């Protein structure tokens, strides 16, 4: 089941991360971040991404609110880090 955290279409190349340190030094333009849960540390690295897919995360969390205000699409999908792999094309409407 897909739940929308922040409205918008997500289209891009998947990058699955276990922790925020996994994305340091990586070009995130046109990427869709796949992560277990939303984290405030992630916020400063979000502006060039196409969207986020999370396994966990509350609709009213600080990070969720930020994503909506920044118009960054975010969907919650159970077991997303097991479903998606790095480099595949992702499209969610």
Model-found features: residue ranges?
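Amphipathic alpha-helical
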Residues: 1-6
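Acidic, glycine-rich flexible loop/linker segments
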Residues: 7-32, 36-93
